[in-house]
Regions:
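Extended amphipathic alpha-helical scaffolds
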Residues: 1-45, 232-372, 559-573, 581, ...
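Flexible glycine-/small-residue-rich
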Residues: 33, 42-44, 61-63, 113-117, ...
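Mobile "lid/hinge" segments at catalytic clefts and subdomain interfaces of large enzymes
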Residues: 140-259, 452-552
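Conserved phosphate/anionic-ligand binding catalytic regions in large, soluble enzymes, centered on
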Residues: 27-29, 122-140, 333-356, 437-457, ...
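Single-stranded RNA-binding regions, centering on S1/OB-family and related RNA-binding modules
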Residues: 557-563, 568-711
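Flexible, glycine/charged-enriched surface loops at secondary-structure junctions
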Residues: 103-109, 144-146, 213-231, 262-263, ...
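Glycine-rich, flexible beta-strand/loop modules in the N-terminal catalytic cores of phosphate-handling
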Residues: 26, 30-109, 115-117, 122, ...
Length: 711
């Protein structure tokens, strides 16, 4: 049944349509926000997926270029694999809704958000997040929502909900907040050194709008929502769990405590073997095999209980640290000989190698998406090979997690990257995870900062990253213990991974993942305070002693840049017909040249002399030819009516036979030859921009002319 609902969001009308499309889906919604239109459809499998210990949720955010009137640039002229922005949006849709499904639910659920039309002032990403909540809430799929989301900006000291394009250009903050009526369930932010208190105020302002949207969606659910279907529960078998707990909890409590991840993993593997042997001895192989899934789930749940109990009741962590203690840290710069900049950052058993490459303007990353942005000058890429966690599996390229972590580290450094005018390089940073035991993205932030300073990139301030975790009471969710610098096991069994990157003066990036029903403002405030203390420690005590500021000189292997500005009208002359002139310069000097529409020219070279030569050639072409001025010329062609003379920069003028000498010249060859270097004066530039030259009355040529005429 078709229904239409309307509300207001940030002073603009938001419309939700249901029952109009995809009648075979479990739930559907079309969101209209201005001229932005996003369709979201959700489906669930009728039967659970067997043999898994996780909830199989998939989210796809599909960018259709027809939404902005573009044809894809690929050979096949159709959308290919999702762009990074689409993958990041898929993750942003996923993270706030995933914790709200039943923990024992194993049916496949698929959320597909398709962007149909885009007005740049109205974010399709936010529409997709709202649409996913609407479609799930009104569907028959078990879901504990609704949730909602908004973007928040900070413009001229004012908090702005869902800022327009013009406002985003002047905003110091790009924040996405998602939540329920009661709590915040997701935070994603890039910021220009925003203080903790201001960031919290922005999150609160966003959540107030979210509450209104959740109430609106709840009203839609009451009117058109379907009853939720019954599902097969995959909850842990209580009897199996109780038996394992009674016989093995004390040992597990001890075995899970180890500084070294390998030791802990070995302890748990041996314990699992002994538990299996216990069941075989007591119940026989056949019955034990039949209960294998229940046994494995019970071991997992008991380990989780031990870790959480240890942290919550004893304020003790598996590796023996205090709840606010950071793992041992170290860093090193200049670790690779021929790259432009490099660093290794180590935090406990997490280690990341970051490498910087400086390139030319033409090497910027081209973007073919729904945004107006066409290229990206600074890029960070994150790789997570299997050996970093001691596994043996082939690499198949970056997955969604790698793209998400890379984007977070990139976001953290963007505010301190020098402008193109200050540092006209394209900058690529690659972070290779060498060993992983949690917080690799935060190690990538620290490693990127160190590598950029090692490369001599004049970043405005160093940036560090740290993550906090959370363990809440089962009986009272308002009681909790917060952990600074979480390792893998604490992330895995905890309720939160609150990542914050920033300088000593403020926050530059946030990414928050949760596994419970959301965060209160008090938790968010404490997380900001904890990460600020830890960040300052890392910056002052670990990174600063290694390299306090960017190197004064670039690596000798990095390209050098010479910049100049030419008249916009001269760009066509420098390039030449079909690129003739610019290619001539490149071939003659071996440099790379980028010319901007505003006349800015960048020359990239490994050889200073060649760079100067190219600069002179460009300036010669770009300089204005002045009537009445004398130029050094070189004869390039002899014709029966005169000679063509190059007067610099590939500009040729005609020296008519009548203008060669005050005396009569019968043949041009009697006076001039190809290759002769002569002085000429520009006496005219005609209406077709043709240059006419003369040698008459020039003393510098007098002797040369007379010799030729006498001969």
């Amino acid at each position: 049944m078709y229904r239409k609902f309307e509300t207001e969001l940030a002073g603009r009308k938001l419309t939700v349509e249901t029952g109009r499309v995809a009648e075979l889906a479990n739930g559907d919604a079309i969101i209209h926000y201005g001229d932005t239109v996003v369709m979201v459809n959700v489906t669930a499998s009728k039967e659970p997926r067997e043999g898994i210990d996780f909830f199989p949720l998939s989210v796809d955010y599909e960018e259709k270029l027809y939404a902005v009137g573009k044809i894809p640039g690929s050979f096949q002229k159709r959308e290919g694999k999702p762009a990074d922005k689409a993958i990041l949006t898929s993750r942003a849709i996923d993270r706030p809704i995933r914790p709200l499904f039943p923990k024992d639910f194993r049916n496949d659920v698929c959320v597909v958000a398709t962007v149909l039309s885009v007005e740049q002032d109205n974010s399709p990403e936010v529409c997709a997040m709202i649409g996913a909540s609407v479609a799930l809430s009104i569907s028959d799929i078990p879901f504990g929502g609704p949730t909602a989301a908004v973007n928040v900006g900070y413009v001229d000291g004012q908090i702005v909900i869902n800022p327009t394009v013009a406002q985003r250009e002047h905003s110091r903050l790009k924040l996405t907040v998602a939540g329920t009526m009661e709590k915040v369930t997701m935070i994603e932010a890039g910021a220009d050194e925003i203080p903790n208190d201001t960031m919290l105020d922005c999150i609160k302002a966003g959540h107030e709008e979210i509450k209104k949207l959740c109430k609106f969606i709840e009203g839609i659910k009451e009117e058109v929502g379907k009853p939720k279907f019954e599902y097969v529960s995959f909850a842990t078998d209580k009897d199996v769990y109780a038996e394992i707990k009674e016989n093995f909890k004390e040992r597990m409590y001890q075995d899970v405590q180890a500084v070294d991840k390998e030791v802990r993993d070995a302890n748990m593997d041996k314990l699992a073997e002994d538990i299996q042997a216990y069941f075989v001895e007591k119940y026989g192989e056949e019955e034990t095999e039949a209960k294998s899934t229940e046994i494995a789930n019970s071991i997992h749940d008991l380990e989780k209980e031990c870790v959480r109990e240890m942290i919550f009741k004893e304020h003790k962590r598996p590796d023996g640290r205090r709840i606010d203690e950071i793992r041992p840290l170290s860093c090193e710069v200049g670790v690779l000989p021929r790259v432009h900049g490099s660093a290794i950052f180590t935090r406990g058993q997490t280690q990341v190698l970051s490498v910087v490459t400086l390139g030319t303007k033409s090497e910027e990353q081209e973007l073919d998406g729904l945004d107006e942005e066409e290229s990206k000058r600074y890029m960070h890429q994150y790789n997570f090979p299997s050996y970093s966690v001691g596994e043996a599996r082939p690499s198949r390229g970056p997955g969604r997690r790698e793209i998400g972590h890379g984007a977070l580290a990139e976001k953290a450094l963007v505010p301190v990257i020098p402008s193109e005018d200050e540092f006209p390089y394209t900058i690529r940073v690659v972070s290779e995870v060498l060993s992983s035991n949690g917080s690799t993205s935060q190690a990538s932030i620290c490693g990127s900062t160190l590598a950029l300073m090692d490369a001599g990139a004049p970043i405005k301030k160093p940036v560090a990253g740290i993550s906090t975790g959370l363990v809440t009471s089962k009986e009272n969710p308002d009681e909790y213990v917060m952990l600074t610098d979480i390792q893998g096991i604490e992330d895995f069994f905890g309720d939160m991974d609150f990542k914050v990157g920033g300088t000593k003066d403020g926050i530059t990036a946030i990414q928050v993942d949760i596994k419970n029903d959301g965060l209160t403002y008090d938790i968010i405030k404490e997380a900001f305070e904890r990460t600020k203390v830890a960040r300052d420690y890392i910056l002052d005590e670990i990174m600063k002693p290694q390299i306090a500021e960017p190197r004064a000189e670039l690596s000798k292997y990095a390209p050098r840049i010479i910049t100049t500005t030419i008249n916009v009208d001269k760009i066509k002359d420098v390039i030449g017909p079909g690129g003739k002139m610019i290619n001539k310069i490149i071939d003659a000097t071996g440099v790379k040249v980028d010319i901007e529409e505003d006349g800015r020219v960048c020359i990239y070279t490994d050889d200073a002399e060649n760079g100067k030569k190219a600069l002179k050639m460009i300036e010669d072409i770009a300089k204005d030819i002045e009537v009445g001025k004398v130029y050094d010329g070189k004869v390039t062609r002899i014709m029966n009516f005169g000679a063509f003379v190059d007067i610099g920069g590939g500009r040729e003028g005609l020296l008519h036979i009548s203008k060669i000498s005050n005396k009569r010249v019968e043949k041009v060859e009697d006076v001039l030859a190809v290759g002769d270097e002569i002085k000429v004066k520009v006496y005219e530039i005609d209406n077709q921009d043709r240059i006419n030259l003369t040698m008459k009355d020039l003393e510098e040529n007098k002797e040369n002319k007379e010799e030729h005429v006498e001969e």
